[in-house]
Every structure is written in structure tokens, then in C-alpha cells.
Design a protein with these regions (language model features):
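Conserved G/P- and acidic residue-centered "switch" motifs that form tight phosphate/ATP-binding loops
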Residues: 35, 121, 182
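Conserved S/T- and glycine-rich ATP-binding loop of Class I adenylate-forming
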Residues: 14, 31, 62, 118-121, ...
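ANL superfamily adenylate-forming
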Residues: 70-116, 124, 130-145
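Conserved ATP-dependent adenylate/AMP-binding module captured primarily in the ANL superfamily
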Residues: 45-74, 95-96, 100-101, 138-161
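Short beta-strand elements of ligand-binding domains
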Residues: 18, 41-42, 65, 79-88
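Conserved AMP-binding/adenylation subdomain of ANL enzymes
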Residues: 136-159, 163, 167-189
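Conserved AMP-binding/adenylate-forming
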Residues: 2-48
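Short hydrophobic alpha-helices that are characteristic scaffold elements of the AMP-binding
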Residues: 28-34, 56, 168, 176-180
Length: 189
């Protein structure tokens, strides 16, 4: 609901910079179900690198954890900003913004996709912009789901431990795959 309130629609970009927390999934699944591209930014990047990613990706909305307030204060990119889990000067409160919104799904749900960035070992971080799913159904299968169920025998009873930062491709994609199958994900901070 928040994404639509800010005019974000199919193929628009939202960016997150968060520590590992269950809210990470609330935001990524919300973006995924809204047909958005969601950029998960490393909390280890400099303000210059983060600004570059926000500008390069075309992010229209940025959500940062209040625990990263030091990094948040140094950003210069002009984008609508929210902080999660506490006050950050210059950022709206995500919790306050969500409170009046309906808890029901949006009417125009469709599948979105992550847009992750490399660590920039040969220069600036590079965004990997994969095509949005052709089938807009939010419950469609994908190659990771088929691999997880076929090779690794994941089921709705599976419990998956993810010890790595969720801004990395493998932890994010595998844990969301477990969710898609109906399993449980345990994340480490």
C-alpha cells in the first residue's frame, strides 16, 4: 500500500538498506508483490557508493534502518526517505507511514524482482537488471524453487538458517525461495 501511495507502479524501483531483521522480508515481499524492482544495498558501502546506487537504479523510495543513522546522514540523493525502527533526521518514520494504511493486499498485485548490485571491486557497483517475470502471477514458480524442491527436497516443513547479510544475492534469493515454498527462515543478525 505504501509503494502505491507514493506512485510506485510496475517496474519502478525501491531501495532498502537494513540489517538482517524480519522487516527485511516484509519490505522485499511487499515490493515483489507490487511488481517493483527492489534494490538491497549493503550496509558496508560508503555514502558515495550508496548515493550512486540510488541514482543509478532510479530508486523512487529509500528505506533505511535507524541503526544505520550514521550512513543515512551522509546521503545526498534526493529521493523520498523513510527510516525503520527509530528516528533519523531528514527521514520519515516508516512505522507512522504504515499505520493508517490498509492491511489488505493491493488490487493490482504482480510479480516483481530484485535488482542487486555487485560490490564494485573494479570500480562503481554494477546493477544487475534482470527482466521482470513475463507471467505477472505472484505465485509462479522459478528455477530456484524447482532446484530447492527437486534437488534439496525443500518442503513447507523445511527450516532454513540464513547466517549471511540479506543484501547479498544468495541469502536473499534462497531465503525468499524457502518462503515461496512455505518453509520457515531463521536469520542471524
Amino acid at each position: 500500500q505504501l509503494f502505491r501511495q507514493h506512485g510506485l507502479g510496475h517496474d519502478d524501483v525501491v531501495a532498502f538498506m537494513l540489517e538482517n531483521t524480519p522487516d527485511y522480508y516484509n519490505l522485499t515481499w511487499g515490493a515483489q508483490r507490487a511488481g517493483l524492482r527492489y534494490v538491497c544495498i549493503s550496509s558496508r558501502l560508503t555514502a558515495d557508493e550508496t548515493d550512486y546506487i540510488l541514482e543509478n537504479s532510479g530508486a523512487k523510495l529509500f528505506i533505511i534502518s535507524a541503526g544505520l543513522a550514521g550512513a543515512a546522514a551522509k546521503l545526498t540523493t534526493q529521493v523520498k526517505r523513510y527510516a525503520l525502527g527509530g528516528a533519523v533526521p531528514g527521514y520519515g518514520s516508516l512505522e507512522e507511514a504504515l499505520t493508517p494504511l490498509p492491511k489488505t493486499p493491493i488490487a493490482d498485485e504482480r510479480a516483481g524482482v530484485d535488482m542487486l548490485y555487485s560490490s564494485g571491486t573494479t570500480g562503481r557497483p554494477k546493477g544487475v537488471r534482470i527482466p521482470l517475470p513475463e507471467d505477472p502471477a505472484i505465485n509462479q514458480s522459478n528455477s530456484l524453487v524447482m532446484l530447492a524442491m527437486g534437488l534439496f527436497r525443500f518442503t513447507p516443513d523445511s527450516i532454513y538458517l540464513s547466517p549471511a547479510p540479506l543484501y547479498h544475492a544468495a541469502p536473499l534469493r534462497w531465503s525468499m525461495t524457502v518462503h515461496k515454498i512455505g518453509g520457515t527462515v531463521v536469520i542471524m543478525k
